[in-house]
Amino acid sequence: MTYISLQDPELGRLMKSRSRLGSRAPGYAAIVFGLPFIETHHTDTMATDGTSIYFNRTFVQRSTDDELLAVLFHEGLHVQLGHHLRRGNIDPTLWNVAADYAINLIVQQARLSLPDGALLDEQYRGLTAEQIVRLLKQKQPDQPDQPEQPQPPQ
């Protein structure tokens, strides 16, 4: 974990985006305002464990302000939907992909600008992460579920 200065330009952009979220989606902003930002190299983008929002400095630097707004909304949705609590024994990578498919369609519907490469597929509209996991498992070779254990931020 890296502690960052309030003078940090990337932290400033995240805080500004979080404030903008307050006017666009106040309920989600309330969730996001309660989560501290922590810099990490364990993810290439941003992530949440339900208690913090982890960010990769390079991702923040290359993202537009509108993309940061969308990603913060995305992370707030993860928390609101309890994705950090519902994974159970599902492989963490598979779970994150399924949860992202479910959430990104909501972000898109809110007319926010997701970064290039965001996981979007209309076939998953209206489905839960659990339902998407089942569909994704049908498309891939059998893989055993992972035992439930704490995972580092992604």
What would you call each of these model-derived segments?
Residues 1-70, 76-154:
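Short, functionally important secondary-structure microenvironments
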